[in-house]
Amino acid sequence: MAAGALLAGAVSVVAPQTVSAAPVCPGAGQAPVLVGRVPGAALEGVAVDGGGRLYTTDLLSGRVFRLDAPGAPAVPVATVPDGGAGALAWASDGSLLVGYGADARVFLGDILRPGAIAKLNTATNVLSPFVSGLSAANGLDVAADGTAYATNDFGTQIGRVFPDGRVEPHWATLPSANGAVLGADDRYLYVSRTFVNPGVSRIPLANPGAPESILDLAGLDNFAAPDGLALDSRGRPVVPANVRGEIWRLDSPGQYCVLASGLPTSSMVVYGQGSGGFSAGRLFRIGFDGAIYEIPGGFDG
């Protein structure tokens, strides 16, 4: 969420004082475990490769970092050519898509369309521009056919990018769509709604004009600022509540519980991959505090 740089100063004071409206998830509630840090960074995007290596982006410097395992140092591997670095997602050709152009222009993203995507060859660390002309690339995911979807939490337009580089900047309309994750069957694109009518929606790829809300927040949680989400192996959305400082799991429409707390400025969550490093089944959180935490209560074994 590009808003993180604006929220971070206030959130660290406010979030610990709030009382959650949601119960702790069964078997969860353990303290988060610090597993990595990028000093001075505001971490925005995250992805894990098949070998368990974690990649993350810095909204401020535009750099992409790699951590080979929990506890390992963050190694800068690339810098985007314009603006802050945003979302990450794996392309069908094995390259890592890197969203960029995440700066003040996103406030007028639907008009200016500053959002762009580059491709990172993770074997050589060569970053090559791919497409531009999106409202933003704050959230990003790729379907099995290679089509990518990109969101802007300060706009209304969700873009679609075809494998050949064609861009459809206004594929769908949903105010303040944030994050992006496709269901296992590519039927739905799941997004958080951060600032406008906060909650979580899913958008049918076959009918993008008919988004379905699966969570509408109310009361104090209306100000929780849900951010970049993931899906567990059962297809349940796992959502960081940025201002709340909590990680939520949505068990059914309208019903959510708390996996972890005490994590203000959380920007995104991701499940690990592979058998080593940031391994499969383990849930990790990044944030605008530059820290990476494991969420033990979110283990998906």
Give the role of each language-model region.
Residues M1-A21:
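Secretory targeting and sorting signals
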Residues V19-V35:
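N-terminal low-complexity, Pro/Thr/Ser-rich intrinsically disordered segments
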Residues T56-T79:
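Beta-propeller domains
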Residues Q30-R37, A72-T79, N125-V131, R166-A172, ...:
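A short beta-strand motif characteristic of beta-propeller blades
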Residues G36-R53, V80-R105, I111-A116, V131-Y149, ...:
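Beta-rich, blade/repeat-based domains predominating
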Residues P198-S261:
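Glycine/small-residue-rich hydrophobic helix-like segments
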